[in-house]
Regions:
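Bacterial N-terminal signal peptides that target proteins for export
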Residues: 1-11
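Bacterial N-terminal signal peptides
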Residues: 11-20
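Boundary at the C-terminal end of the N-terminal hydrophobic targeting segment
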Residues: 22-26
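Low-complexity, Ser/Thr/Pro/Gly-enriched N-terminal "stalk/linker" regions
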Residues: 27-94, 117, 286-287, 291-294
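Active-site core of glycosidic bond-cleaving carbohydrate-active enzymes
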Residues: 62-64, 92-127, 185, 189, ...
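The feature captures the catalytic groove of carbohydrate-active enzymes
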Residues: 81, 85-91, 134-164, 171, ...
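Acidic/aromatic-lined carbohydrate-recognition and catalytic surfaces
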Residues: 166-169, 173-191
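Non-catalytic C-terminal accessory modules of carbohydrate-active enzymes
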Residues: 348-506
């Protein structure tokens, strides 16, 4: 999951509840707390079948609150087509960054066709006149949101957006199996323009990015107060107006190049896939060498206006998985991990992740009324707590590997020491709907409720010679995850309507 995904994902959004100041009739200040109301389950006719249960009552309560809030933001009868809110509350709109970071939670809630429509709206609106940008934010009337767009010369745009959306499109292809993502000419044009023309127009190639000016392609009225300095912000940080490149720009570009390569593999374009895997590796090498401060043992945060590297924060790089598994990774996790739920789950600290997750679920402690928070919370439970992720080997291997399947399910329980059991029901995965139950970190039960047979990799922490599958010992495969963590797994086929139980030795 991506917590949402910000360099921020669960980070930028997990803000404290907004407190605003109004004025009473007598002219004195009156404190108004926004987002304090409970959302009724009947607030929106769209229903989600996703259910979560656990020995951890606080986690269940928080999940259900997030689910209700997220589903209250779902709409189906506006000119833009099926959509959910993914912007500041009250905008009646969805922006590129937030959609990319909410998409996983939305898919889990059963909103695959909403994701497809919204992502396609962004894809269809890239244009030469906007220097291959799309509309940063689209409202329910299928217009560029007026608050962010005046015309093709004057508009708000954060440059990681194209990359973030491309990566989200590939992820949603994996989870939904919808071939529109890899065959629709509208999507293909967006992908192609993003990794070529967009990169060239905005000076984002590896050879240029470290020396690019902060602003390029300045158009419109000189000195325009709002849009002139915001048409091509080189990161998601909107508070600093001096930097030339944010680490999130490189991190999202890396993710986009990899996603593009995988899409080309799916389409059988081996040469293009190899080219963009190599481009992704060039970015990864740049980050792990030039952006690393060897003396201070940290990654830099940005390129400043004088083109020197400055600041430090590894969160962006860890979120998009750019950091090599080396001593740098341990330092990076220590530097930024405690602030990012997904990073805590990914690198093996489920107890800390749970505490952070419970904190943002607590009413009055987080901006639950901000759409990214509830959607990302749902995604965090799916990908983090339950450890459910999809694996997609290269499609180019399909002709040489006898056991190749396009997509398989991989689970690694992350209940930690405070959760005895947890169960997620009715999770959509491509043409299937599944239920997964973890009993501690040593036993998992997988039910293929509907759809064709699935390949499931059941993983458990530690090095084990055998795992038990439906009561019978089966040789396990032992792998080493980043930071030297051993996991043992077995590959199991779960037929339609079937249930398989896998357990590890105590």
């Amino acid at each position: 999951m991506r917590f949402e995904r910000t360099n921020t994902v669960l980070c930028t959004c997990l803000l404290l509840s907004l407190v605003s100041v109004g004025w009473g009739q007598a002219g004195g200040p009156e404190r108004l707390i926004t987002g304090a109301s409970e959302v009724s389950p009947l607030a929106n006719p769209t229903r989600s079948r996703l259910e979560f249960d656990s020995s951890d009552a606080r986690l269940v309560e928080g999940f259900n609150r997030a689910k209700r809030q997220a589903m209250a933001y779902v709409f189906d009868k506006d000119p833009v087509g099926p959509w959910y809110e993914a912007a500041e509350p009250g905008r009646e709109a969805f922006c590129m960054r937030d959609v990319a970071h909410q998409a996983m939670g939305a898919h889990a809630l059963g909103l695959a066709r909403y994701n497809l429509n919204m992502l396609r709206r962004f894809a269809e609106n890239v244009s030469d006149a906007k220097d291959w940008c799309s509309f940063w934010e689209i409202d329910r009337f299928n217009r560029p949101a007026p608050v962010d767009y005046a015309n093709d010369s004057l508009f708000w745009y954060n440059l990681p957006a194209n990359f973030d959306i491309l990566d989200a499109c590939y992820r949603m292809y994996l989870w939904s199996g919808d071939l529109s993502y890899v065959n629709d000419p509208v999507f293909l044009n967006f992908y192609n323009r993003t990794v070529t023309d967009y990169v060239e127009r905005w000076g984002l190639s590896v050879d240029e990015i470290m020396t690019r000016p902060r602003l390029l392609n300045v158009r419109g009225i000189p000195g325009h107060k709002k849009f002139q300095s915001a048409r091509g912000i080189p990161g998601y940080d909107e508070g600093n107006h001096e930097y030339a490149v944010g680490s999130d720009l490189l991190a999202t570009e890396y993710a986009a190049f990899l996603a593009y390569a995988r899409i080309q593999e799916t389409r059988g374009n081996a040469d293009a896939a190899r080219t963009f895997r190599a481009k992704a590796e060039e970015i990864r090498t740049l980050v792990n060498t030039k952006w690393w401060n060897d003396e201070g043992h940290y990654f830099y945060l940005r390129v400043g206006k004088d083109h020197s590297l400055e600041g430090h924060d590894s969160g962006n790089l860890l979120y998009w998985n750019v950091v090599d598994d080396s001593p740098r990774l341990k330092s990076a996790v220590a530097d930024a991990g405690s602030r990012r739920i997904e990073v805590l789950y990914r690198y093996g600290d489920p107890d800390a992740a749970r505490e952070r997750l419970l904190d943002i679920m607590t009413p009055g402690r987080s901006r639950m009324e901000y759409p990214e928070v509830p959607f990302s919370t749902v995604g965090a439970v799916v990908n983090g707590t339950m450890g459910i992720n999809l694996v997609a080997p290269s499609a180019l291997l399909s002709g040489v590997e006898g056991g190749w399947v396009e997509t398989s399910v991989r689970t690694l329980p992350a209940l930690g020491t405070h959760i005895d059991w947890a169960e997620l029901r009715n999770l959509p995965i491509r043409a299937n709907e599944v239920t997964l139950r973890h009993e501690g970190n040593r036993k998992t039960v997988f039910t293929n409720q509907s759809g064709p047979a699935l390949v499931w990799y059941a993983e458990f922490p530690g090095s084990h010679q055998n795992l038990t599958v439906n009561g019978k010992p089966v040789p396990a495969r032992v792998e080493t995850l980043p930071l030297g963590r051993a996991v043992s797994s077995v590959r199991v086929t779960v037929g339609a309507g079937g249930t398989v139980t896998v357990s590890a030795p105590e």
